[in-house]
Amino acid sequence: MPELPEVETTRRGIAPYLEGQRVERVIVRERRLRWPIPEDLDVRLSGQRIVSVERRAKYLLLGAEAGTLISHLGMSGSLRLVESGTPASRHEHVDIELASGMALRYTDPRRFGAMLWSLAPLEHELLRNLGPEPLTDAFAGQRLFELSRGRSMAVKPFIMDNAVVVGVGNIYASEALFAAGIDPRKPAGSISKARYLRLAEEIKRILAIAIERGGTTLRDFVGGDGQPGYFQQELFVYGRGGEFCKVCGSTLREIRLGQRASVYCPRCQR
């Protein structure tokens, strides 16, 4: 699933080609995504100028003159630029054709993504209750410490809760916990303030590096320019169960936490 760095990589890749451009038309080949694409999306968006391309959590917000297109990539989705009129394959469901002769193409083999229209996107039910962005000053270890008091749930699903902080998915939660030396099974409420301060800094550091590297390519992800992400070359634990720890040489263990596979080092993470 594309996580925050992959979505931010996509945003940075497509924004220069979209901002300031007028939409010529919207071609929808398949409306049945996680939520149906509005039947009047072509009417609402055609003729409008795209004024901004922003991100909130894992949602891309294409701001037009009279509303905003909210897009989510789901489990396997991608947005990339093609020349208008480029033949579409089976899973290429939407083209937003621009006056420049380019088109923003949405591809989603599993159809778990979304394209929705909103006049007030930050008040939309999908966005209004989200926690702070991890790469802003609004997110810090103090917040993790305060929200975790009295919580018995494991720390990994705790930091993956979008009400706590947005955009920390399975890949980057695993890597941040390893970097901070914290066992992902440890109860969130038992972790000290000092360790949360360290964890927050590692979350910020790892997400920033992942964005710089263009995200992590696992199965389907490509950036807005069609290129893969390269952060997978720097993974310490995610997807490496049974392999040797790059730091201490111990065998990495794979467990299930919150219905997700989690890999950790029994020696480095306590």
Swiss-Prot record:
Subunit structure: Monomer.
Cofactor detail note: Binds 1 zinc ion per subunit.
GO terms, molecular function: 8-oxo-7,8-dihydroguanine DNA N-glycosylase activity; class I DNA-(apurinic or apyrimidinic site) endonuclease activity; damaged DNA binding; DNA-(apurinic or apyrimidinic site) endonuclease activity; hydrolase activity; zinc ion binding
Chain's role: Involved in base excision repair of DNA damaged by oxidation or by mutagenic agents. Acts as a DNA glycosylase that recognizes and removes damaged bases. Has a preference for oxidized purines, such as 7,8-dihydro-8-oxoguanine (8-oxoG). Has AP (apurinic/apyrimidinic) lyase activity and introduces nicks in the DNA strand. Cleaves the DNA backbone by beta-delta elimination to generate a single-strand break at the site of the removed base with both 3'- and 5'-phosphates.
Homology family: Belongs to the FPG family.
Annotated EC: 3.2.2.23, 4.2.99.18
Catalytic reaction equation(s): Hydrolysis of DNA containing ring-opened 7-methylguanine residues, releasing 2,6-diamino-4-hydroxy-5-(N-methyl)formamidopyrimidine; 2'-deoxyribonucleotide-(2'-deoxyribose 5'-phosphate)-2'-deoxyribonucleotide-DNA = a 3'-end 2'-deoxyribonucleotide-(2,3-dehydro-2,3-deoxyribose 5'-phosphate)-DNA + a 5'-end 5'-phospho-2'-deoxyribonucleoside-DNA + H(+)
Name used for this protein in its record: Formamidopyrimidine-DNA glycosylase
PANTHER family tied to this protein: FORMAMIDOPYRIMIDINE-DNA GLYCOSYLASE (PTHR22993:SF9)
InterPro entries reported for this sequence: DNA_glyclase/AP_lyase_DNA-bd, DNA_glyclase_Znf_dom_DNA_BS, Formamido-pyr_DNA_Glyclase, FPG_cat, MutM-like_N-ter, Ribosomal_uS13-like_H2TH, Znf_DNA_glyclase/AP_lyase, Znf_FPG/IleRS
The keyword Electron transport appears for this protein: no
Keywords: DNA damage, DNA repair, DNA-binding, Glycosidase, Hydrolase, Lyase, Metal-binding, Multifunctional enzyme, Zinc, Zinc-finger
Cofactor(s) the record lists: Zn(2+)
Active-site residues (renumbered): 2-3, 58, 260
GO BP, one annotated term: base-excision repair
FPG-type ZnF: 236-270
CDD domains tied to this protein: EcFpg-like_N (cd08966)
PROSITE patterns, alphabetized: FPG_CAT (PS51068), ZF_FPG_1 (PS01242), ZF_FPG_2 (PS51066)
UniProt xrefs under Gene3D superfamilies: 1.10.8.50, MutM-like, N-terminal
Amino acids binding DNA: 91, 110, 151
One Pfam family recorded for the sequence: zf-FPG_IleRS
